[in-house]
C-alpha cells in the first residue's frame, strides 16, 4: 500500500469517527436527559429503535422490575418493535393497548362484560341503529370522526350505549372509552417507569389527548417526523399535533440527525425535494430538522449506487407492452446474491415496488407469469366496513344468545316483524326473546350448518437464495424498507394528482417512498399508459439532475437487450 493510499484510509477513518461521535452525542443527549416529556424528531431510517433500546436498557439498569410501555400505530411496526424490544417492554399498537386496559380494568370498561367482543364493523351497525331509533333523522352522524376529535356529546354517548348493548367494541371507540374514563379520573391511569411512542405523527387528536393523560403519571418519549404524515384523510392525524408538541415549552425537543438506512444519493434527493417543495410554498410550518447521510454505515453502498435510475418507457400496458414489469424483472435478475442474503437474513424485502393500484396490478401480473412469488395485499377496498351474513353466523356459532349476532342477521334479512318494530326491539336487552320463534329456529338451523372458511394459508416464500418481492401502495410503504426500491407511475395526475394544486401529503408520499431504499432506487414513468398520454411527475424535476441516470425504454431498446442476453447493470 502506498503512503498516499494509507493516508487516504486514515483520513476516511478519522472522518467516520467524527460522524460516529456526532451521532453518539445526539443519542447521549436524549438518553441522559431527565426531562419527563421528550419529543425526538427523527427522519426515515434515523435509528429510533436503537435509541428506544438504549432508553429502556438504562431504565432497566436502574430498576430491574421497571414497567415499560411502547406503542405505535402501524401493526407491522409493532411486530418489528416486539422483535427488538419485547424483553425490555410491553409493545402494542395503541388500539391493542387500549383493548388490554379495558379487559383489565372494570372502571374503564364500565358497561361492558369482561369478555367483550371486538367487531371492527360495529360503527356501520350503530349507524343503522341511529336511523332506526331516530326516525326524524335519517342521516347518521360520523361517529368515528367525532370520537377521533375527542368530542364527548350525546351523539358519541349514543355510540357507547349501543356498544354496551352489544357487548362489543371497534377500534376507535376502545380508545375513546379509555380517554373518557381517564379524563374523569386521571389517577386511574397505570404508571410506567417509561412510555415510548413511535410514529407520533400518525396519532389523531383522541389518541394524543389520551397520551397526554398517560404522561401525567409516567415519563414519556414520543418520536416521529412531520415529513411522514400520510394518514390525515384516513384517520384524522395532522401535522399540527407533532409540530405543537415540538414547540411546546412542556416538552424537551431533540433530534436524531442521520439517516442510517439510505445511500448518499437518496438522502441528497430527499433534501432536494424538501427544498423545492418549500420554495414552491408547500410544507409550511415544517419542523426544521437535520437529515444527513451517514458514511460509517452507508459509505460502501453509496459508492456502489451513486445515482437514482429514472426509467421512461414509451408505453405501459398488459402483455408484451408491460415495460414496467419487463424492466423490473430484468433488474431483479441482476441483484447480487449477497444483497439477497442480507435482506433474507434481516427479514425485510429484497425488492419493494411502490405505486398506485393500476400500475402495481400490471407489474404483478408480469412477474407472476415469470414464476416470481410476490408478497402483495389482496385488494379489499370498501369491504372492511361491509357487514356480511357470515359475520352474524360466526358470532352465533360461538354464542347462540349474542345480541350482536342476532342484530346482524336481522340487518341482513330485514324481516317485517323487525322493520315494523325496530325501535322497540332495539331498546330491549337481550334481543333474542324479542325475536319470533320461527325466525330463531330458521337462523339456528343455518348456524348449525355453518362452517367457518379455513384460515388463509400463509403466503409461500421463495427459496432462500431467491429475492423476496413486495408490492405496496404509497401509504402502506410506511415502516418498510428494501435493498432495491421501484417507484412506479410517477406522473402528473397520479403523484401529484394536480400539479397546480399539490397537497403536502403527496410530497410526503414521495419522500417516504424514496427513503425506503437501502441500496438502489428506480423511478419509473411512461409516456402512454393503456393508450392515454402521460407526463412525468413534476416531483422528478425537483431532484437535482446530477443525481439521476435516465434511460428511455421502448421496443427497440428491449429487443436489443434481449439479443445481448445480459441483465441491466444495477
Regions found by a protein language model. Give the residues of each.
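P-loop NTPase Walker
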Residues: 1-109, 515
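Accessory N-terminal region flanking or inserted into the helicase ATPase core
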Residues: 2-46, 50-51, 112, 116-196, ...
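Inter-lobe coupling/hinge region of RecA-like P-loop helicase motors
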Residues: 11-31, 36-44, 250-258, 279-351
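Catalytic acidic motif of RecA-like/P-loop NTPases
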Residues: 196, 200-204, 209, 227-228, ...
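Conserved RecA-like helicase ATPase core segment
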Residues: 208-305, 310, 540-548
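Conserved helicase/translocase motor-coupling segment
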Residues: 315-436
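Conserved helicase C-terminal RecA-like lobe
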Residues: 394-533, 538-542
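Helicase C-terminal subdomain and adjacent C-terminal extension
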Residues: 523-570
